[in-house]
Amino acid sequence: LSKSLEQYKVSTEYLFTIKDSQTAVVIVSLDETGERSFNFYRHNTADLLLTSEHLNHIKWDELSTLHFCSNTLTNLAIANTTVSALKLAKNNHKLVSFDVNLRYSLWQNSNDIEHNVHACYAYCDIVKLSRDELNFLSEQTQQAPDDYLQSILDTGVKLVFLTDGPAPATVYHKAFILNESAPIINAVDT
């Protein structure tokens, strides 16, 4: 995997090898309408074994952005490492981007989802979520979806991108709301 990335000129400087661990695998399938489904194989995988000590090797002054998704919040140990990375990124004045990207089957306890996701907003500049994710998270907090969106902005997030399948995407900011249609495409691969 590392050699393949390097062949395509992808930096592997922060690719850590964790002894006696496996690589997570996801099989993505497309149905006849282009809708994706996922099968995850994630037992004793390196992504779950990353620790705050690994973060000490990051040269924050050479980076501009930290991007993450909720797959790094699915259990306590990796969630703690993620929050440590978020704190380091903010302390080093880096842009933090969060694609919520909920994959429910990865969570050990579904009751932790909203709490772990919401705990990250205070460190984020940009949040992206889908309409389905918004509906799920707002239900968990017994808020209307618009109120939940406002609660994200109230944490200091500057932009919230809301996607809704083929419907126009919406960008929320404290001062404006923008709707933008996406071009119609034929999904071949993801």
Question: Which residues fall in each region the model found?
Answer:
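Acidic, amphipathic alpha-helical patches
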Residues: 55-56, 117, 187
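Structural alpha-helical scaffold elements that stabilize or flank donor/cofactor-binding regions
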Residues: 58-59, 119-120, 153
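Conserved N-terminal subdomain of the carbohydrate kinase-like
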Residues: 1-68
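Conserved phosphate-binding/catalytic region of the ribokinase-like
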Residues: 87, 142-190
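Conserved beta-alpha-beta core of the PfkB/ribokinase-like small-molecule kinase fold
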Residues: 70-150, 166-169
